[in-house]
Regions:
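N-terminal, well-ordered alpha-helical segments
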Residues: 66-73, 106, 110, 127
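Short pre-catalytic strand/loop immediately N-terminal to key active-site residues, enriched for Gly-Thr
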Residues: 84-97
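Broad, structure-driven detector of short, well-ordered beta-strand segments within folded domains
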Residues: 42-44, 87-88, 145-148
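Conserved beta-strand termini and adjacent loop/short-helix elements that scaffold enzyme active sites
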Residues: 55-56, 89, 141
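ATP-dependent small-molecule kinase catalytic core of the GHMP/sugar-kinase superfamily
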Residues: 2-31, 118-173
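N-terminal beta-alpha supersecondary unit
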Residues: 2-82, 93
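Phosphate-handling active-site elements
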Residues: 76-85, 111-128, 132
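DPxDG-like acidic metal-binding loop motif
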Residues: 96-124, 138
Length: 173
């Protein structure tokens, strides 16, 4: 049985410019996304049927609101796969704006691709990810990218962060 361990990295938006609000509730933006070392950890393996999800936090559930489960369902609808078990260790604060849920979804897409030897291209994974959330496409490749539209139009860059940086995330209110 294949077991896949993957880190699911956070991102920061550098120089975020909100251009306007769209009729669908999203905003058109221009930004630079930078992947950072802070990450969640996922262990993903095959199972006979369905998506079995567990986590080290009690606020994430194995339901249709969970982005990991949503990512699995998209792949199951498109490809001949059975099930997966997902164990998620959360290290990134929820609601922090660092994209942890989107990053987790992208990690599930990439892991299913490898575990089931699907050979789906990054471009196709990006297309699937865009149906899950605006930040998911960025996390398929990660690194440093210019993001436009709602964040789904991406152009890769060489890393722009040099030196050290400090991210302050307020605790839960």
């Amino acid at each position: 049985m294949k077991i896949f361990k993957i880190n699911s990295y956070a991102k920061v938006n550098m120089g975020l410019k909100i251009l306007n609000k769209r009729s669908d509730g999203y905003h058109n933006i221009s930004t630079i996304f930078q992947e950072i070392d802070l990450h969640d950890e996922l262990i993903i393996s095959k199972n006979i049927n369905g998506c079995q999800f567990s986590s080290n936090v009690n606020w994430l559930h194995n339901d249709q609101n969970n982005l990991c489960v949503i990512a699995y369902n998209h792949m199951k609808d498109l490809y001949d796969i059975k099930g997966i078990d997902i164990m998620l260790t959360k290290n990134i604060s929820r609601g922090s704006g660092l994209g942890s849920g989107s990053s987790n979804a992208a990690a599930v897409l990439k892991s299913i691709n490898k575990i089931y030897d699907l050979n789906v291209s990054d471009d196709d994974l990006i297309e699937i990810g865009s149906k899950i959330g605006a930040d998911v496409p960025f996390f398929i490749k990660g690194g440093t990218q210019i993001g436009e539209g709602i964040g789904e139009k991406l152009i890769g860059l060489k890393s722009v962060i040099k030196g050290r940086y400090l991210i302050i995330i307020p605790g839960p209110t």
